[in-house]
Amino acid sequence: MVIILTIVGLILLTGFQALVNSLKKTYLIEIQYYRQFNQASSSLNWAKKQVWQPPSEQWQCLLDNQYQFKACIKKSRLKIDNYTLLRAQADDYYLYMLTYFADNHLIIEKGHWLDYCPEKRLVDCE
């Protein structure tokens, strides 16, 4: 009887340990996602205040070494309006924003923040 209780207890502890490991992995993945999202979001806000050269067909990037911000702009290929595509990067996570370009600054309109690239072809997002 003692052996059966020991085996059942061992099985329960093993199952509980597997559950804890799974939850810990999920937690670490979510922490990394939120860190990257917040870093990319901060990069977007930083990029709005920078002085840019006129956008071209190629990505033009600015870096901030102190805070590890990276943001890039290029002309959007969307047929509507004359958008400039702003891309902020944190590791391998990207956020996008459709903006207008005037006087070497980006003009932002509310509602143009995106967590996906709005271009039709994937190659235009790389």
PLM feature spans:
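Conserved functional hotspots that engage anionic ligands or polymers and/or phospholipid headgroups
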Residues: 26-27, 34-38, 45-126
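Short hydrophobic alpha-helical module
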Residues: 15-19, 43-50
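Aliphatic-rich helix starts adjacent to a transmembrane/signal segment
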Residues: 3-38
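Charged/polar interaction segments and conserved charged motifs
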Residues: 1-3, 7, 53-57
